[in-house]
C-alpha cells in the first residue's frame, strides 16, 4: 500500500518540477530579453542577442511549446499574458509615479532635493514588467532549489542510515571477536549501543518532527470537519422545529 501511494506522489512531484523548470526558463528568458531591451545600449543588444545562452534556451523552449500546443494557441496565450502583464505593470508604474511625486513634495518641504532623491521610484511600465518577471523567475527557481535540496537531503539521510547500520554491525562483530573478557565486552557493547542510539536520535529527529507536524495537521483538519458536522447537525433540528 505504501509503495502504491508513494509512486503517484513522486510522479506528481516530478511533474511539478518539470513544469516549474519550463516556467522558470520562460520567465528568465522573458526577463532577460526585456532587460536587454530596456537597460542595454543598442550596440550591446546586438552583441548579446547572438551570444546569450538564455536567448537560445528561450527560442528552443518556444519551438517546443509551438510543437506541443500549436503556433496559434501559443500566440493567443502569449498575447493574453503580455496584455495582462502590461496592464499590471502600467498600474504599478502609475502608483510609483504618484508615490514619487508625494515623496518629492515632502522632501522638498524639508529642504531636500526631492526630485533627485525620488528619481529611482519613477519606473516605466516596461521597467516594472522587467522587475516582475525577474521576481517571478526568482520565486520559481527558489521553489525548485528547495525541492532539489529536500530530495538530496532525503537521499543522503538514507545513505547515512545504511552506512551507520553497516558500521554498527562491523563494530559489533569486531567487539565480539576481539574482546575476550565478558565484562569489558559488555561495557564496550553498551557504549556502542548508546552511540548508535544517539546517532539515530539526532539524525531521525528532523524527519520525525516533520511526520509529527503532518499528523498534527491531519488531526486538526479532522477536528474541524467534526465541528462542522456537529454544527450542521445542531442546525437541522432547529430548522425542523421552526417549520
UniProtKB/Swiss-Prot annotation:
Residues 105-135, 206-243 are cytoplasmic. Residues 1-33 form the signal peptide. Pfam families: BRI3BP. Functions as a voltage-gated monoatomic cation channel permeable to both potassium and calcium. Plays a role in the cellular response to DNA damage. This is Voltage-gated monoatomic cation channel TMEM109. The chain crosses the membrane at residues 84-104, 136-156, 186-205. It catalyses: K(+)(in) = K(+)(out); Ca(2+)(in) = Ca(2+)(out). InterPro entries: TMEM109. Residues 34-83, 157-185 are lumenal. Keywords: Endoplasmic reticulum, Ion channel, Ion transport, Membrane, Nucleus, Sarcoplasmic reticulum, Signal, Transmembrane, Transmembrane helix, Transport, Voltage-gated channel. It is a multi-pass membrane protein. Disruption phenotype: Viable and normal in appearance. It comes from Mus musculus. One of its GO terms (cellular component) is endoplasmic reticulum. It is found in: Nucleus outer membrane; Endoplasmic reticulum membrane; Sarcoplasmic reticulum membrane. One of its GO terms (biological process) is negative regulation of programmed cell death. One of its GO terms (molecular function) is voltage-gated monoatomic cation channel activity. Homooligomer. Interacts with CRYAB; in the cellular response to DNA damage.
